[in-house]
Design a protein with these regions (language model features):
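Local sequence-structure signature of Cys/Sec-based thiol-disulfide redox active-site neighborhoods
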Residues: 7, 120, 211-239
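Internal/C-terminal transmembrane anchor helices
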Residues: 157-185
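C-terminal cap of thioredoxin/glutaredoxin-like
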Residues: 224-225, 236-243, 310-385
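Extracytosolic (periplasmic/ER-lumenal) interhelical loops and adjacent juxtamembrane/interface segments
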Residues: 18-67
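Structural alpha/beta surface segment adjacent to cysteine/selenocysteine redox centers
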Residues: 6, 227, 233-317, 345
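Hydrophobic alpha-helical transmembrane segments
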Residues: 66-88, 107, 111
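Interfacial helix-loop-helix junctions of multi-pass membrane proteins
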Residues: 16-28, 108-139, 188
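Cytosolic-side transmembrane helix boundary signature
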Residues: 137-168
Length: 385
C-alpha cells in the first residue's frame, strides 16, 4: 500500500510537470525525493529526462507526446486499490488474488530497472522524481511478494481462476485510461509552429560558417550553438538519437555565451565557451567531432572554464594536441568566430542558445525540446524516420 501511494504521488508530480508545458512556456519542475515538494528551477536532471526521447510515446503525433508517467499513474492507482482490497479482506482474500497481486506487483519494478538503465547509459543523470518512482516500485514489489509468502497453514479460500482472468485486463485498462484522457485533451499546436519568424540574412561564404552535413541530407538547416550550453547539448543529442542529424545539411554558427568574445554579454554565462568555440573552428573537417567531444565532456570543460584559461587549455591540448591550441590563439580563428557573432547580430538572434532554422524558417524555442519530433513531422517530415 505504501509503495503504491508513493508511486501514485511521484507519477502525479511528473505528469503535472509535463502537462504544465503544454502552454509552450518554461516552468519549474517538482524534482525532489520528497513527495509533494514545491517545484524548483534547480532541476537540470529532471528537465533532461523530460526532454529525452524516452519520456513519452507518440511524439510525432502529439506535441510533446504521451508521457510514460501517465501509464505509471494508472498502474499505481490500480495497485493502490487492489492493495486496499487485500488489506480490508484480510484472511478472506482468495489465495489466487494474493498470488495475482504478487505476480503483477513486480512489473513496475521491472519497468523501473529498464528506465534506470536508460538514465545511466543514455542520459548520464538520474531524475529525483524518477528515482522516487523506482523506490516506490521496489516497495510495491517487496510488499506484494512478502504478502504472498507462506506463513504456515492458511485459512484463505483458493478462489476462482476468474479473479486473475478479470483483473489482468482491468490492470491494462486502468493503466491506459489516463493516457487516453490526456491524448484526447492535447491542444493542436500546428498553428503556433510558424509564428517565430524567418531568417533575415542567408549565410554567405564570407560568414565562414561551419558545415555539418549528414550522410543522407534532404533538408538545409542553420544552428546557432554554444558548446558549453546544456540545452544545446540536449538538443544535439536528441537529433542524433532520432537519426535526424544524418538527414540535415547543417551550417553551424558558433554563438558562445561568454563575454570574453561575445560583446552582447556584460558577463559570462558559460565561462570558457569562447575558447572551446575556437577549438571547434580549428577542427575544420572534424568540427562536428570536436563539438560532440565538447558536449560529451561539457561538465569537465565548464568546471575548467570557471577555474581559468590554463586549466581549460590543458584539457583541449590533452585531447586535440598543441597544434589545436596554436590555432585557437591565432588571429584568423578569432576573426572567424567574430564573423559568426556578426552573422548572429545581422539576423537578430536573441542571446540564447540553441537557435534553430529549418531552411529559412525559425523553429520556436519551445519546439526544440518537448515538441521537437512533432515539429519536425509537421514542418519537415522528410527528416523524420
Amino acid at each position: 500500500m505504501v509503495g503504491s501511494a508513493l508511486g501514485l504521488t511521484f507519477a502525479s508530480s511528473s505528469t503535472l510537470d509535463y502537462a504544465a508545458h503544454l502552454d509552450r512556456r518554461l516552468h519549474d519542475l517538482h524534482c525532489s525525493f520528497v513527495p509533494g515538494a514545491p517545484p524548483t528551477d534547480a532541476a537540470e536532471a529532471c528537465r533532461t529526462a523530460m526532454y529525452s526521447p524516452y519520456a513519452a510515446l507518440f511524439r510525432d503525433k502529439y506535441w510533446g507526446g504521451i508521457p510514460i508517467s501517465l501509464f505509471a499513474l494508472g498502474a499505481f492507482a490500480f495497485f493502490a486499490g487492489f492493495a486496499l482490497y487485500l488489506l480490508i479482506a484480510g484472511e478472506r482474500a482468495p489465495r489466487r488474488a494474493v498470488g495475482f497481486f504478487a505476480l503483477v506487483g513486480v512489473t513496475p519494478l521491472l519497468v523501473s530497472l529498464v528506465m534506470a538503465g536508460i538514465s545511466a547509459t543514455q542520459l548520464g543523470s538520474f531524475c529525483k522524481t524518477c528515482v522516487g518512482i523506482y523506490i516506490s516500485s521496489f516497495l510495491l514489489a517487496l510488499g506484494a511478494l512478502l504478502g504472498a509468502a507462506p506463513k504456515g497453514p492458511s485459512e484463505r479460500p483458493l478462489g476462482s481462476w476468474l479473479v486473475p482472468a478479470a483483473f489482468l485486463p482491468a490492470l491494462g485498462a486502468v493503466s491506459l485510461v489516463p493516457a487516453a484522457v490526456y491524448a484526447s485533451s492535447v491542444p493542436d499546436h500546428r498553428p503556433y509552429l510558424g509564428l517565430c519568424g524567418s531568417l533575415k540574412k542567408e549565410p554567405a561564404a564570407g560568414d565562414a560558417l561551419l558545415r555539418m552535413t549528414g550522410q543522407r541530407p534532404v533538408k538545409p538547416a542553420l544552428f546557432f550553438e554554444d558548446p558549453l550550453c546544456p540545452t544545446c547539448r540536449a538538443f544535439h543529442q536528441r537529433l542524433a538519437a532520432e537519426g535526424v542529424l544524418e538527414r540535415l545539411d547543417v551550417q553551424l554558427a558558433l554563438f558562445p555565451l561568454d563575454s570574453e568574445c561575445n560583446w552582447m554579454l556584460s558577463s559570462a554565462m558559460h565561462p570558457g565557451a569562447c575558447t572551446v568555440s575556437k577549438a571547434v573552428i580549428c577542427g575544420k573537417d572534424r568540427g562536428r567531432q570536436v563539438l560532440e567531444w565538447a558536449y560529451d565532456e561539457q561538465e569537465a570543460l565548464s568546471r575548467a572554464g570557471k577555474l581559468g584559461a590554463p586549466t581549460l587549455r590543458a584539457l583541449i591540448e590533452k585531447r586535440w594536441g598543441a597544434d589545436t591550441l596554436q590555432c585557437v590563439d591565432s588571429n584568423d580563428t578569432k576573426q572567424i568566430l567574430n564573423k559568426h557573432l556578426h552573422f548572429a547580430t545581422e539576423n537578430g538572434i536573441a542571446v540564447s542558445t540553441p537557435q534553430v532554422f529549418l531552411g529559412k524558417q525559425r523553429i520556436c524555442d519551445e519546439d526544440t525540446d518537448m515538441g521537437l519530433r512533432y515539429t519536425l513531422r509537421v514542418l519537415a517530415p522528410e527528416v523524420v524516420r
